[in-house]
Amino acid sequence: MKLLQNIPPYLFFTGKGGVGKTSISCATAIHLAEQGKRVLLVSTDPASNVGQVFDLAIGNTIRPVTAVPGLSALEIDPQEAARQYRARIVDPIKGLLPDDVVNSISEQLSGACTTEIAAFDEFTGLLTDASLLTRFDHIIFDTAPTGHTIRLLQLPGAWSSFIESNPDGASCLGPMAGLEKQREQYAHAVEALSDPERTRLVLVARLQNSTLQEVARTHEELAEIGLKNQYLVINGVLPEAEAEHDALAAAIWQREQEALANLPAGLSELPTDTLLLQPVNMVGVSALKGLLATRSEALPLPVTNILYTPENLSLSGLVDDIARSEHGLIMLMGKGGVGKTTMAAAIAVRLADMGFDVHLTTSDPAAHLSTTLNGSLKNLQVSRINPHDETERYRQHVLETKGRDLDEAGKRLLEEDLRSPCTEEIAVFQAFSRVIREAGKRFVVMDTAPTGHTLLLLDATGAYHREIAKKMGSKGHFTTPMMQLQDPDRTKVLLVTLPETTPVLEAANLQADLERAGIHPWGWIINNSLSIADTRSPLLCQRAQQELPQIEAVKNQHADRIALVPVLASEPAGIEKLRELMS
């Protein structure tokens, strides 16, 4: 494999959720450890599952992976990092300043952007700790899905320039002291990321057009900010031998080969490896060792036709239940890459076909909704909350209102404050709350961003709710977006997942997070299931067999109601293909 040749000290894996970054980064770490290298595997993903892959509680201190001599691992927990970050700033001023001032500073440091910057603080510490490179030959980062990774990797430049030019900033991060000390570290982190002798970036993708387009955007964006040493790994490719068995396998193989032959510009020039689809899920050291191994394409697997025949678990049945309320907010949540965009579009089309007025909207940074829905339908409105546009609109609004009575120095200070990366979080949230107000009169179907973003969005919603409640006190009736999200008569949250171990685990974790926020998911959609797709391919049958325990777990342990959606022979783009998902 090209990926495994002349590996520099730092290796980053990035890509959409569900493409196999964790599996490949873990397999690479095992490979290097078996070559006698000392390896540290670091996860900075809010939806981290490295511990689950190795069946080991890892946590945020370096610990050896007992099953693999030479390998150690570390997980950065963003929430814990934020707590420690707050304590570092707030503890020294307790008792020195009035309680209300201390509480105000603590509150300023409780938002989503603090969590992100705190996790990044730890990330920077690892990149700039010279002693780590005396203990380890390689440090491998299993980073978060694409949108989050881009923001994470853009932060060092954004924050170091912001701190440089804004020593007295009124940023929502509160006092800049917590960052001021690390200014040099941020600069060194940027330097390390941009140095091809020290850092290699591995883009991980599956052979699906939307995934490849997203990876191409990531490639361009990261190359622009200096990360030019990039490799591409295409994971989960169906072996040609499987295409002989039936129409579905042949269609999947054909579709993947066409995608491989027509890689987006930029990707085709990168050093590229392809990994074949595995018959088992990548959990445990022995399975991971097989992932990078060279082997024959033809798998001697038993030919059994697995067809899951449960009671009515169709997507159309789920939508018919939703339609009874005649209006409301439908939010699809889940990890990136599970098909939220497609499911949201299919649900919106079904409701519009039933005669309802529907507004379909997305805040997904990848924004491939327009690709999925290329055709128009009466009584269906499609819109996108564009993070860049919303941020600009928000900045202008703040400058025109808060900035109206400021002198020139004050205006300059406010402008600088609005250049803080956390401004985008606030702007996107405001746009989101504008859209959900419409749900009293029609159906609003919202395709939310991948897991990490979704949790940040909900955190912002909760902070807004607390602010309104504080201002209103006990007087009067009021409704905040958070109250609407918590009301099952007005909001139906659907969790979308895939019938695989890790996606189900992550969706269950997301459900637990939602329930802590007082939101109980109305149902689950299990997408891309082979177990209800009629196939005689030995490999696909083996994969279908692997799905059954996961489907049963969702049904019996997690969900009030579920829908099962099969793998289709062609990608569901366009209205007719979306209608097929309902049959």
UniProtKB/Swiss-Prot annotation:
Any coiled-coil regions, as ranges: none
E.C. number: 7.3.2.7
UniProt keyword Nucleus, yes or no: no
Claim: Translocase is one of the keywords in the record: yes
UniProt cross-references to SUPFAM superfamilies, sorted A to Z: P-loop containing nucleoside triphosphate hydrolases
Reactions accelerated catalytically: arsenite(in) + ATP + H2O = arsenite(out) + ADP + phosphate + H(+)
Domain of life of the organism encoding this protein: Bacteria
Enzyme category, top tier: translocase
Keywords, sorted A to Z: Arsenical resistance, ATP-binding, Nucleotide-binding, Plasmid, Translocase
Annotated ATP binding sites: 15-22, 334-341
GO molecular function: ATP binding; ATP hydrolysis activity; ATPase-coupled arsenite transmembrane transporter activity
InterPro entries (alphabetical): Anion-transp_ATPase-like_dom, Ars_ATPase, ATPase_ArsA/GET3, P-loop_NTPase
Family listed: Belongs to the arsA ATPase family.
Function (record text): Anion-transporting ATPase. Catalyzes the extrusion of the oxyanions arsenite, antimonite and arsenate. Maintenance of a low intracellular concentration of oxyanion produces resistance to the toxic agents.
The protein, known as: Arsenical pump-driving ATPase
